[in-house]
């Protein structure tokens, strides 16, 4: 029986070819935590992380791979950015389709003097990009948009 999976936008399933095998190889052949020891397996783990940072820095055109940080999940990442970067008087734009992981901290930040506007979306969930430029102000510090919606599939 063929399986149909309809929640692709909210998870990382199914894994790309080779990902599950690479994870299994790491877990069975190394499996140690990074920066926890001075032995060959620990050094191998650090090398994997460093190489991954380098690849991501290249992908995103960062000048230094140390600017790549890893977090447990996207909610933690969003909170680092929103709560660590913005200050009272700042303004951000969020898409009207944003997930609660974005909207809850954004609404909380509004009570601290950080304003936001929502970028309107069409009925199919796609953003009305022409509105973005109209909503940008001198104090706009970030534009937060989702890549794919697990609500409507766009």
Task: Label each region the model flagged.
Residues 1-154:
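Pyridoxal 5′-phosphate
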């Amino acid at each position: 029986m063929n399986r149909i999976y309809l929640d692709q936008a909210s998870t990382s399933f199914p894994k790309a070819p080779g990902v599950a095998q690479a994870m299994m190889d790491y877990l069975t052949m190394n499996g140690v935590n990074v920066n926890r020891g001075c032995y060959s397996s620990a050094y191998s783990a650090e090398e994997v992380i460093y190489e991954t940072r380098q690849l991501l820095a290249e992908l995103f055109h960062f000048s230094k791979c140390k600017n790549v940080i890893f977090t447990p999940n996207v909610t933690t990442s969003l909170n680092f950015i929103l709560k660590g970067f913005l200050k009272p008087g700042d303004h951000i734009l969020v898409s009207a389709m944003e997930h609660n992981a974005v909207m809850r901290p954004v609404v909380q930040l509004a009570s601290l003097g950080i304003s936001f506007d929502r970028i309107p979306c069409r009925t199919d969930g796609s953003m009305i990009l022409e509105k973005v430029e109209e909503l940008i102000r001198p104090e706009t510090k970030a534009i937060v948009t989702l890549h794919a919606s697990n609500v409507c599939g766009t």
